[in-house]
Amino acid sequence: MIGTKEIYTVLKADSGVLALVTNAGTVEKPNFRIAAATVEPKTWQVTESTITIYQSGPDSLGEIYDVNHTVNCRASTETKAKNLARAVATALHRVTFSKMMFYCSVEQVIPPADETDNFNNPVTVRVMGTK
């Protein structure tokens, strides 16, 4: 999963993102609801603001790779989900790591399917670079 670890690293260190994500821990020992996973952990609540990161495009086998990831920005209201998605895109867009760069686009908000769901504003992160 080229880029997943790097996306996670940036988001866990960005104060703008962390200010909007639920902290289930304490000030001394924070536990922010950010995970590299396709499905949210079962312990996370529908009322929380959360982020999940996963590779959503195929692996590139060439020397130059171009791989898409999805960052799901979920929250109890549409406005909170949009604000979180904007913060994620701002934190990641045009960030460079060794041999890779991120380009972001904020997708349309997906409304809750039912009362057990919340709003999701996905961010597509295009990870480009050389191996």
Locations of regions flagged by a protein language model:
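Mid-chain, well-packed structural core segment of small domains
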Residues: 70-91
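Short, charged interaction patches at domain edges and termini
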Residues: 1-13, 54-66, 100-131
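Residue-level detector of short coil/turn "hinge" positions at structural boundaries
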Residues: 18-19, 69, 99
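Small/polar-rich, solvent-exposed N-terminal microdomains that initiate assembly or binding
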Residues: 1-58, 79
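A generic structural signal for short, solvent-exposed coil/turn residues
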Residues: 26, 43-45, 63, 98, ...
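A common structural junction motif
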Residues: 16, 89-98
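Short, surface-exposed, polar/charged, turn-prone segments marking secondary-structure boundaries
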Residues: 79-84, 98-101, 130
